């Protein structure tokens, strides 16, 4: 049961140190478990975002034989019917941020949304995988800002003049799709362990 995980380690499936750093910063010191990063080779599933997240989490839990947290991020262009969506990783590798912007060159609609899904498994195959989602609306722009974090340079959230890459990390971490998904995750764990997360400095900033 998830309620019995307080104080224990959860394997966060990532080989990206910056991603782990950002997740820990957002969750804060009130999160009842310790996240440890571990790179795991998972199959590249295809399908809808929820389906992909569940299958990846189930496979990660099978390999780890314990509690795991798996993150999937989609960048969805409305003009392209939601693409690249869960396949943004390969689009970014081939096209870079400039190419992502150029994909929409022939479209008036530059709107997009960033979707983050965290899938959590206790490690027990008989328990369902739980999904926690966060979405931030924005638009695709000419890349600006630091190039050390994926497609951040070409995504400008609604209501802001800066791209994700131009924002101070602390500011980005109060509006991002990742923040919103982690807020849902934190609230779930807080409901299992009363008093946890009550004093998080960013609470209330993530609901749009």
Curated annotation (Swiss-Prot):
Details of cofactor binding: Binds 1 divalent metal cation per subunit; can use either Mg(2+) or Mn(2+).
GO MF annotation list: dITP diphosphatase activity; ITP diphosphatase activity; metal ion binding; nucleoside triphosphate diphosphatase activity; nucleotide binding; XTP diphosphatase activity
Binding-site residues, Mg(2+): 44
Chain positions with N-acetylalanine modification: 2
Compartment(s) of residence: Cytoplasm
Required co-factors: Mg(2+); Mn(2+)
Catalytic activities: ITP + H2O = IMP + diphosphate + H(+); dITP + H2O = dIMP + diphosphate + H(+); XTP + H2O = XMP + diphosphate + H(+); N(6)-hydroxy-dATP + H2O = N(6)-hydroxy-dAMP + diphosphate + H(+)
GO BP term, example: nucleoside triphosphate catabolic process
Major subcellular location class: cytoplasm
Pfam families according to UniProt: Ham1p_like
Binding site for ITP: 14-19, 56, 72-73, 89, 149-152, 172, 177-178
Alphabetical keyword list: Acetylation, Cytoplasm, Hydrolase, Magnesium, Manganese, Metal-binding, Nucleotide metabolism, Nucleotide-binding
E.C. number: 3.6.1.66
Gene Ontology CC: cytoplasm
Family statement drawn from the similarity comment of this UniProt entry: Belongs to the HAM1 NTPase family.
Function: Pyrophosphatase that hydrolyzes the non-canonical purine nucleotides inosine triphosphate (ITP), deoxyinosine triphosphate (dITP) as well as 2'-deoxy-N-6-hydroxylaminopurine triphosphate (dHAPTP) and xanthosine 5'-triphosphate (XTP) to their respective monophosphate derivatives. The enzyme does not distinguish between the deoxy- and ribose forms. Probably excludes non-canonical purines from RNA and DNA precursor pools, thus preventing their incorporation into RNA and DNA and avoiding chromosomal lesions.
NCBIfam families, alphabetized: RdgB/HAM1 family non-canonical purine NTP pyrophosphatase (TIGR00042)
Subunit annotation: Homodimer.
Protein name: Inosine triphosphate pyrophosphatase
